[in-house]
């Protein structure tokens, strides 16, 4: 009977249809009775059915709800993982931005150092070579009757410009003697700190406006004085332009003197509050520049403006130190008192420029290699100004590119030096002569080093073709077609020979009815005056269309120095 019961139990458990599990439960309950009390009852067995797994899952779910705790949450947060390689391009771009920001200080300072030495070269030219060139031009003018009037021109155009610069420099220097520096110092010192801060900001804006318009006045004077006589008179005359240039240089020199006086008052203040406020003004410049959209040309213009501003600040600090040393009878101990303030002003200027350029390049996706292009463009100006037939003098080229006009600053520095240093006795005059020869040596050495570096930068940027491709000649009075205006490459000399052979040569005088071959230096072209081809294009197009923007760095000059937009 026990064997029959054991055989029937599986049949009862497995013979069911829909209610198989219920019948299986009954079979398990009937097994002890079916054994008839013979032997110990077998151990209960759990059959692997779907209902068992469902109940186990419900049991685990109920246990999971009851066991939710802060420890399990913290454990999940600490062990949760993620994979950055799913967004590899994004993180690679962010890493390159960090590397670009780290490269900005080095590349920017290399550009700044090169640009400052360019400004120094143009500034030393006024004190060293310009007086010698004026002397040679006057000597030619006085000795011209001895050689006869073989040429229709009494002087070369460059000599006329040199004489005009020298006369303007001398006249403005004597006019500056009527401005009392001591009275201006005490007048500014009696003002409140906030008023002086406002005055200093107004002076910075006025300096930019003067620099933007001043070179136009000087260029108009140079062109009016050297314009060929055959052309139709379309100007007011040389004398009015000359008086305008003298008035501009005099007013700009007074403006820079007020800036230097305000800075001197800040240095001599007891609590240094004014100096701190003036330094904080540099950090306000970050707010006005960082959050604007910048293109490469806009950044190039702003870099040139920063170079000019930094060099001007160095000269202002030199003037402040000279005035303070004069007041303390040239006591060298007082120089160490001024030294921390001078270093603080220079360090704040450098820090502001680095932060400003770093975030501008970050927000506008500009690489750090763009500063090498800017440096090559400045080097191109220097090399092209030393060519056999250059468009303009190098100092004027720097003025057009950066907005740095050396004449007003030179007038003020001469005025301060002559009033601060008294020359008495033969030994003092001998020291002055030796100092002048030292300036000439410094100018020559600086020019040689800059010229060598500039040729290197031009070759690295592969810009030699622009130096060796002069424009095609055309006779005046006849309109040239577009095909005739295309530049033809020069033959007979290689690029390296052109760079080495054409530098430091004097221009050859040609006939007036033939336009000479000039080096294509686009830096001296005015943005406001289109060429003949551009005039034809604008006449064919509608009047509502503006001229296309010039994207070549060599075509960007200082005409938009007061703003950030390049037309």
Swiss-Prot record:
InterPro entries: Tatp1. GO terms for biological process: cartilage development; cell projection organization; embryonic skeletal system development; neural crest cell development; ossification; positive regulation of bone development; positive regulation of cartilage development; positive regulation of cilium assembly. The modification Phosphoserine is found at residue 523. The modification N-acetylalanine is found at residue 2. Residues 1-10 have a biased composition (Low complexity). Residues 1-60, 466-499 are annotated as: Disordered. It is a multi-pass membrane protein. Pfam families: DUF747 (PF05346). Belongs to the TAPT1 family. This is Transmembrane anterior posterior transformation protein 1 homolog. The lineage of its organism: Eukaryota, Metazoa, Chordata, Craniata, Vertebrata.
